Amino acid sequence: MPTINQLVRHGRKRSVKKTNTPALKASPQKRGVCTRVYTTTPKKPNSALRKVARVRLTTGMEVTAYIPGVGHNLQEHSVVLVRGGRVKDLPGVRYHIVRGTLDSIGVQDRKQGRSHYGAKKPK
């Protein structure tokens, strides 16, 4: 336990929290251009072909972002909006692409959880 005098001289040390999304530079989302769109396989107990894209952000950094939902229209030079949020079974994928904004269209025929996939309300 420090004395009052020690606290006056040195003060308390602030703990610095390391960010999980450094490429966003403390913004909620960032715009970027797809440089490569491809599929990759997840870690050990799971098996699939996960759709991911390599994106060059406006901050100048290049990140790997996950494309959520069933089917997508993204290709090289597509302009996308990237948010934070990792994919647990894909190592190195710490960002998600926001569906339904810029060049990324929303998921077709989506009835539930539509707001996460940029899908309009069905008529």
UniProtKB/Swiss-Prot annotation:
GO biological process: translation
Cited InterPro entries: NA-bd_OB-fold (IPR012340), Ribosomal_uS12 (IPR006032), Ribosomal_uS12_bac (IPR005679)
MF (Gene Ontology): rRNA binding; structural constituent of ribosome; tRNA binding
Keywords: Methylation, Ribonucleoprotein, Ribosomal protein, RNA-binding, rRNA-binding, tRNA-binding
Keyword Transport tagged: no
GO cellular component: small ribosomal subunit
CDD domains in the record: Ribosomal_S12
The keyword RNA-binding appears for this protein: yes
Xref: SUPFAM superfamilies: Nucleic acid-binding proteins
Transmembrane residue ranges: none
Region (Disordered): 1-32
Pfam families: Ribosom_S12_S23
Modified residues (3-methylthioaspartic acid): 89
Family from the record: Belongs to the universal ribosomal protein uS12 family.
Oligomer and partners: Part of the 30S ribosomal subunit. Contacts proteins S8 and S17. May interact with IF1 in the 30S initiation complex.
Function: With S4 and S5 plays an important role in translational accuracy.
UniProt protein name: Small ribosomal subunit protein uS12
Organism: Desulfatibacillum aliphaticivorans
